[in-house]
Amino acid sequence: MTLALKKPHKSARKPKGDGHLRRGEILAAAERIFIAEGYAGATIRKIADAVGVSSTALYMHFRDKDQILLEIGDDAIGQLLAVNVDIAHRPIDAVARVRLMLEAYMKFALDNPNTYQLAFCGSRDVISKEKQAATAELGDRCFAEFSGPIHEIAAAGRLRTGSGESAAQVLWAACHGLVALLITMPDRNWAPREELMKVTLDGLLHGLVTD
């Protein structure tokens, strides 16, 4: 299904001296343009026009559109990492920690669909592996925090099937699949999203973990 995407909104030109606008404003405009026009169609000029500054002013913040796209991903992964670290250190059962992390992941995706698509749906594959190295390291840290309690469950002999690593990958993949469908196919007659998330987590965790 092809989404009908709106053309990015063009802001009035900022008065001279306002070229130091917050990076967040640039990133928000860039998100919309990357989603609407794809990587090839997104240009520094279009992003600058959308926030009402000159291309020269935008280059004061970002050297190219690759850096913008990577920062969008880094910000998203960084937020999820902070959540995972917080949950990982809570004195509750490992299964409860896994559930909280996955709930937070899905809610983040659905509350920030543009950000999520750019960070987790292959948009950055056009960027060289060298440029993506720092982002990949951040992603590995985020996944390590998530998979930690799953390895605890495995070490305690509570997994019905698979290993800690395979269980972690399946849990992530399943939740990613749900939110990706909800984001990219919003016009389907979906059940309420909270119910879908609950059914997904109930089915996955009850199927993988013994009582």
Task: Report each predicted region and the residues it spans.
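N-terminal intrinsically disordered/low-complexity leader segments
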Residues: 1-21, 32, 211
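Helix-turn-helix
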Residues: 21-25, 29, 33-67, 71
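Short hydrophobic clusters on alpha-helical segments that form packing/core surfaces
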Residues: 26-34, 76, 80, 105
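Short alpha-helical functional segments enriched in proximate histidine and acidic residues
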Residues: 33, 87, 108, 149, ...
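Short coil/turn segments at alpha/beta junctions that flank glycine-rich nucleotide-binding fingerprints
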Residues: 36-40, 91, 112, 156-157
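Hydrophobic alpha-helical connector segments
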Residues: 71, 85-115, 167-171
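Amphipathic alpha-helical linker/stalk segments
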Residues: 72-100, 130-136, 140, 152
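Hydrophobic/aromatic-rich alpha-helical bundle segments in the mid-to-C-terminal region
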Residues: 116-117, 121, 128-136, 154-202, ...
